[in-house]
């Protein structure tokens, strides 16, 4: 199976600050330093040795890094299947706008699906990302990162899949800054299967380890298999 990904990435001023604070307060989730910052603003800055390496204070939007993924699947039994994946990512984004890395990356991973019942599955994957000559904070960037995810999938109706999963990946940067360290997230959402070649994913990701990833991510993906 061949799959292509062409992301569109936008960094914009906040517009959900108040609802996000209310959501965390209602569920008793940690607010961290969120309430002490101005609302509905964007500031992404990084300085090292008195040199400013990243300084984004306005909205940015562009095509991200395009990637191609190739998979081979083996059915172990009528309940279990394992697939092996390889991916190459090309630097089509703009690293100065943080919509790309400026480097060509390779990733290898394996994935497993286990059927619990006709409409319920456990799934997981684990792999390794290899990157060289990354132009985003190149002096502290690591050449590899490991990633693992596991979750459960439920299909209440034929074209609809609901999912909940945990995701973790090791740090891509060699630094003591918390935001650039290992990441742990909880993601929930669903998939609408249009046909055998097309499907749409909608997901929301919440940071489990506060301060290492954005408070919340909204993801919309359209997959086309060839």
PLM regions and their residue ranges:
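Transmembrane beta-barrel domains of Gram-negative outer membranes and organellar outer membranes
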Residues: 1-132, 139-226
